Amino acid sequence: MAFPHLQQPSFLLASLKADSINKPFAQRCQDLVKVIEDFPAKELHAVFPWLVESIFGSLDGVLVGWNLRCLQGRVNPVEYSTAMEFLDPSGPMMKLVYKLQAEDYNFDFPVSCLPGPVKASIQENVLPDSPLYHNKVQFPPTGGLGLNLALNPFEYYMFYFALSLISQKPMSMTLHVRTSDCAYFTLVDRYLSWFLPTEGSVPPPLCSSPGGSSPSPAPRTPAMPFASYGLHTSLLKRHISHQTSVNADPASHEIWRSETLLQVFVEMWLHHYSLEMYQKMQSPHAKLEVLHYRLTVSSALHSPAQPSLQALHAYQESFTPTEEHVLVVRLLLKHLHAFANSLKPDQASPSAHSHATSPLEEFKRAAVPRFVQQKLYVFLQHCFGHWPLDATFRAVLEMWLSYLQPWRYAPEKQAQGSDPQPRCVSEKWAPFIQENLLMYTKLFVSFLNRALRTDLVSPKNALMVFRVAKVFAQPNLAEMIQKGEQLFLEPELIIPHRQHRLFTVTTSFLSPWPPVVTDASFKVKSHVYSLEGQDCKYTPMFGPEIRTLVLRLAQLITQAKQTAKSISDQYVESPTGRSFLSWLTFGLTDTNSCYPANDLDEIGQDSIRKTDEYLEKALEYLRQIFRLSEAQLAQLTLALGSARDENGKQQLPDCIVGEEGLILTPLGRYQIINGLRRFEIEYQGDLELQPIRSYEITSLVRALFRLSSAINRRFAGQMAALCSRNDFLGSFCRYHLTEPALSNRHLLSPVGRRQVTNPARGPRLSLRFLGSYRTLLLLLMAFFVASLFCIGPLSCSLLLVLGYVLYAIAMTLLTERGKLHQL
């Protein structure tokens, strides 16, 4: 009788797979709810991996599953509500997870699908620096290949859920999906609110049915005691702590799901950078333990550990986060700040920390510094260094700024909403700023370097500079950052080898030092060394080097403001605002027209006004942050004004003055390539020999050139005699037969202008204007209009000639001498 019972799970799985193809989505979910309620865990065990994969898609991205990243309530309301009810933290799927959790089932998760650094580290037989992987790695007898993690149902579900964000292919650009409206984003928010509550405690696991077995309050692998939490908890201690049982402390079971969820999200979403960087961040003490553990594992497997170069070779794929990925990480950071700030004042005080507190309260204190800070810093560095120089960087920027402002998510923030003035950053946030110093200073410098390479005339780029400047200009924030830098730069005079013990913080180490300042200095140094290594070279944010960069940015802001004003003037004077009659005038298009300026020409005056407003406020904020004087900013404006041409509109590319003139800087080359700036260069040669334009008929221009050249050679003497007369006929001939006076042109060198000495040419006739498409079109239109009034071609031609002669006589009378007239 055992045979049919053993075949039952396979039959159930086959039935569900068939239903997934034949039944509609809502009906399938209803059937799954009944299956979860009616069948015991032993029969659901085989269904669970298939169900998870069918929901979140395969780890290789081939199967999309329910496609939660594109599922929106306003587009597919029925499917959206059904999926959200099924996957809710209190929904049927989590009941299935808890039912399997109670029976202590494990599921294999392939190591090859983990983030690159973790995968390479495990394949090198090195335990990653995260409690999430302890006691879970299953090394095969042959070693090397086919590694798996033995995960409990909750871990397995969360691994798939988190990895589906990055394993699935990016959404098509043709799909207009707002990330905040999609089902995946909403589920992340619900899971964070459920397992990281800002009020009350974590809800207990739900029993799947009254007759079923209730889930165990403890996971298969117990969470480590929070007494061992620190900036860098010992790997060996963590390894030992995971060997022990926590059944003696039932209160610690309250937060194991919260801890697991946070670790999974951080590891899957933030742990993406080179293995070399990962190893660089390890403290010397941790590296010794890693080496000891690697030797132990290698000895147990009877095979030598792979060298680190092979691990680095195995991790060669470059990881580029998507905008959707960054937005989800920002949601995580905002919720973590609210979660950590939900501690009551008496619980958050150091004195309360020394007394007995609940595991959830300890977790609130340790969540950000213990799990998030290090990986987020390197993740942000990667984004700042590799993200394209376009407006999509706004997502990364807002994620960074959200982390820098935990006070925005504090409970007292609600009472500040009605005050339009920026509130002073309280001194109680000084420890957070000091322990996250590099997040403020080094990443600010990285942003400066990006801003110096972007087109600040674009309103989106101007907005990003404004946002950063506004955040750092909050009252008292710059002072606290500067105080943190002073603490880090404080010389170490007491313990010469203190840097080797920065990552084993104990009371015995701190006791011989002065109580307040040295302790704060020690924490800042610990933070910097843990993220950058002990051989890092720190550049102060308020030092002379960064101040030079800020002045450079201020100069670019001033340039951008002037360019925006110039574009605004050109917008008013653009051809779209000219009259129809002015378009009908004969003549060539300006041969020295400038490059296409900026997308502002197409956006309009409103965006130009916003750009000027953003840049003006950003400049003021930078002046407040770095205490720039009005004289310095005025000097920048004066220096820029001297580099502009006579009409006060066009600006030169960025350059320096050398011995032989101006030399382009890298920024200047960037400005020329992108059409942001140009040198004012005019054609100085024979106007008749200019290249044929796209608006001209090539064969006709060449024929007219040969005809006019023959006429000029044949009648050169007569034309010269006519133009030399001092009467009206002479002025009339000079108006038509004299070319532009080359003696009035200049070599437009910004360093020094000098006149050009060119040999004078005699009067000559130019018929090139007749080779223009526009001229021929106007003539055809004139003949067509004349035909409507029953005027023949010959009569129309005579009228056109007569009209032009009258126009030329009027222009001759108004002209004192021959003027520049390009035909």
Swiss-Prot record:
Residues carrying Phosphoserine: 130, 245, 749
InterPro entries: Sphingomy_SMPD4 (IPR024129)
Short name of one Pfam family: mit_SMPDase
Record-level GO cellular component terms: endoplasmic reticulum; endoplasmic reticulum membrane; Golgi apparatus; Golgi membrane; nuclear envelope; sarcolemma; trans-Golgi network
Membrane topology type: Single-pass membrane protein
Keyword Disulfide bond listed: no
Keywords associated with the record: Cell membrane, Endoplasmic reticulum, Golgi apparatus, Hydrolase, Lipid metabolism, Magnesium, Membrane, Metal-binding, Nucleus, Phosphoprotein, Transmembrane, Transmembrane helix
Activity control note: Activated by phosphatidylserine and tumor necrosis factor (TNF). Inhibited by scyphostatin.
Superkingdom, taxonomy of origin: Eukaryota
EC id: 3.1.4.12
GO terms, molecular function: metal ion binding; sphingomyelin phosphodiesterase activity; sphingomyelin phosphodiesterase D activity
The protein's name: Sphingomyelin phosphodiesterase 4
Organism this protein belongs to: Mus musculus (Mouse)
